[in-house]
Amino acid sequence: MTHNFLLKASLLYKDICPEQSRFLLQRHQSTAAALPQSIICPFCFEWRKLGNHHVRLRPKRKPTARIRRLLKRESAGKRLSAEQTAVLQKFKRASNAMMATCHTCNKVSRQPGMNRELLVSLSKHKSTPGSASKHRTPQTVNWATPKSVANRTPSSTPRSASSNTSSSSSSKSSSVKSSPFARLKKILMLENKQQGKKGGLKDFLSSL
């Protein structure tokens, strides 16, 4: 039987007959390349699916007082002995682990995760604000800071423009304020003119 046939047959019997599926998968694992532990149990060869296993994350061990002292000595550039270096390397290479408990065989499989050295190297390769500014093209720089805006300073702006704007604004405000008084003045002048015309007509009639 070929490896591909064993794998497909195991997948076919996964829900119909789990015992037959585990037997076929065991034959496949013993003769072909092993499948990862994230999809099968390495002990009973049960396909992992929702409800047939329990997963928990085991964190990295915390640094002790001795390891904290060694880390301070290393950051200060002091020389460490061979034993101290080995202890420090063991701490840096420690990683978290994913613990999966199979409900069929009740055995726990351990899958290692990332260690501290890998996390430090990944953090160093991340982009920084300086590197982001280096990758900016000249076009984006020109768009971000136009010359007309960048060259304008408070000292270079003409004072006449500011004075004109202030005078125009003051004239507008004064015209708005004095408009009711101007209308009232015009009304009074019209009344005086009308009264003057009436008096002239009386004088003319009396003279006749």
UniProtKB/Swiss-Prot annotation:
Highest taxon above the source species: Eukaryota
Polar residues bias locations: 138-152
InterPro entries (UniProt xref): DUF4674
Ranges of biased composition (kind: Low complexity): 153-180
Annotated Pfam families: DUF4674 (PF15719)
Signal peptide: none
Ranges of compositional bias, category Basic residues: 123-137
Entry similarity comment: Belongs to the UPF0711 family.
The name this protein goes by in its record: UPF0711 protein C18orf21 homolog
Species for this entry: Danio rerio
